[in-house]
Structures are given as C-alpha cells and as structure tokens.
Amino acid sequence: MSESNRLRIAIQKSGRLSKESQKLLKSCGIKFNVNEQRLIAHSDNMPIDLLRVRDDDIPGLVMDGVVDLGIIGENVLEEEQIERQTLDKPSECIKLRQLDFGACRLSLAVPTEFRYQDASSLEGLRIATSYPNLLRRYMQEKGISYRDCMLKGSVEVAPRAGLADGICDLVSTGATLEANGLYETEVIYRSMACIIQSTQEQSEAKQALIDKILSRVNGVVRAKESKYILLHAPTETLDQIVALLPGAENPTVLPLNDDTNRVAIHAVSSEDLFWDTMEALTQLGASSILVMPIEKMMG
C-alpha cells in the first residue's frame, strides 16, 4: 500500500484514554510499539500510523482531514465542534461508534457551604471550567447569565483560590471534588470514548481497512459485554433454564454420554450472569455451571 493509503489514527498521548485506546487497537490485531519520546508509531503488520497527540487536538485533526480516524472522549469532541461552528471552521466528522471506556460526566459543583437549589443559584456568579462551550450552551438553555473563568487544569481549586464561585468540570467518582471541599450539583453532559472518522473521501483500499478495523472493534467490544456459559441441565426443566439465561440466543444443547435425562447447554450471554441467576439455575437442577469471559467475537 502506498504512503498516501496508510491509515492515520490519532489517539491521546497521555491521560485517561491513552492506555485503553492502545489496548483496544492491539486487541484488534494491530501490532505496534510505542516509544514515549516519539509522537508517531508505525504498525508492524498493517499499513497504519498511530499519532499520539493532545486529546483536544484530535477532533480538529480528524475534521481537517489530517488523520483518518481518532479515538476521543465525546466531551472533547462536542466542545471542539461547538467552538469550530462559532468560528465557521470545518466541524463535521463521522462518529463510527461509542466505545466501552472513558465514562465520565461534566458537572457543575460548588463549595460545601454554598446553598444550592438549582442552576439558577449560579446567576451572575463566576464559574471556572475547561469546557466553556458546553457550559455556555447549557446555561443559555437554562436562561442563566454567569461569568466564566477559563482554566486548562486544576479547575477544582478555583473556588478555594478565590478565582470562582463554582466550577464545571469532569467527574468520575467525585473524590477529587470532596477533597477540595466541593459537591456535585448538576450533570450537564455525559461522555464515553468514541471513534470518529474524517468526512474526506477515502480511497477504496483505505476505506476497506477502516471497515475491517471497525468490524474488529465491534467484535472486541461485544466480547467484553458477553460471557460464555456452560452447564448441565435436566431435560424436564430445559425450557425454564434457557429462559433464565440473560441475553442468550439459540443456545447449543448437546446430549450427555450415558445420561438421557440431562443435557449440556452452551450459550453466549450478552449480559452479566449474577449470583441470584446462578442460584435460580441450580434450583432448577442445573449443575457444573461455568461462566467464562470471551476474548473476541465475530459474526
């Protein structure tokens, strides 16, 4: 494949999505070695170049057609799209799919002593954030005026430092807020990681490679959400047992050697098999119940 047909994928150089993005691509069979001193890693087995950049640069690189694919948080994507629409710059991309990592929420938070009733409690106050566009959109929808304090990091210290009355920042567990004397009041945006593609027309070879990668990503994500279940079941309660298997479709039922009253069931479940379900299966006579993770799925 020529240099122009090499697929370029942008991922976060460091931070909460970096390792998961690399893990996903490797699970898709893309072999590469990352040198922390270099921004580009070349795949050993596919015509793919991996660009390791700042997360807030990824949407623009995809929208401008500099790279073909990007793995990015939906919050960063949405923030950049609003910014570019304001500046009349290219803001279109194709969201191929949401991924199963990078979950977070963008929330308003205030000091513990603040008497908060609803978002209107922030009327006229100063709010520190790294996401001014998402905050502005939310507050405009609520009809609330405020003053913003733009910070690139350490947003949670702004109230104690006297820079702001409240904040709008990413929250995962809330532990950082609590450590800084803040509490969460409103969720304004929920986000996961996603894969985006440039809207520029691709060559047939490059689009085929993109389709192959997306198919593999779908298989990896689906496998994570599924379990392989094996058990022995009495034939008299077979229908009840199959009905209990969460998300199972068309389980394989096999006869057991020298036992006409019991069968073996193999099934792929798209949901977790919890202890109460396993106990219910046991009460129906099921035995030798095994629940195993699945590494990859296709078809």
From Swiss-Prot:
InterPro entries: ATP-PRT_HisG_long (IPR020621), ATP_PRibTrfase_cat (IPR013820), ATP_PRibTrfase_CS (IPR018198), ATP_PRibTrfase_HisG (IPR001348), HisG_C (IPR013115), N-reg_PII-like_a/b (IPR011322), N-reg_PII/ATP_PRibTrfase_C (IPR015867). Its EC number is 2.4.2.17. Pathway: Amino-acid biosynthesis; L-histidine biosynthesis; L-histidine from 5-phospho-alpha-D-ribose 1-diphosphate: step 1/9. One of its GO terms (cellular component) is cytoplasm. It catalyses: 1-(5-phospho-beta-D-ribosyl)-ATP + diphosphate = 5-phospho-alpha-D-ribose 1-diphosphate + ATP. Catalyzes the condensation of ATP and 5-phosphoribose 1-diphosphate to form N'-(5'-phosphoribosyl)-ATP (PR-ATP). Has a crucial role in the pathway because the rate of histidine biosynthesis seems to be controlled primarily by regulation of HisG enzymatic activity. Feedback inhibited by histidine. This is ATP phosphoribosyltransferase. It is found in: Cytoplasm. GO terms for biological process: L-histidine biosynthetic process. Pfam families: HisG (PF01634), HisG_C (PF08029). Belongs to the ATP phosphoribosyltransferase family. Long subfamily. It comes from the Bacteria. Keywords: Amino-acid biosynthesis, ATP-binding, Cytoplasm, Glycosyltransferase, Histidine biosynthesis, Magnesium, Metal-binding, Nucleotide-binding, Transferase. Its main location: cytoplasm. The gene is hisG. It comes from Shewanella loihica (strain ATCC BAA-1088 / PV-4). The keyword Lipid metabolism does not apply. Its cofactor is Mg(2+). One of its GO terms (molecular function) is ATP binding.
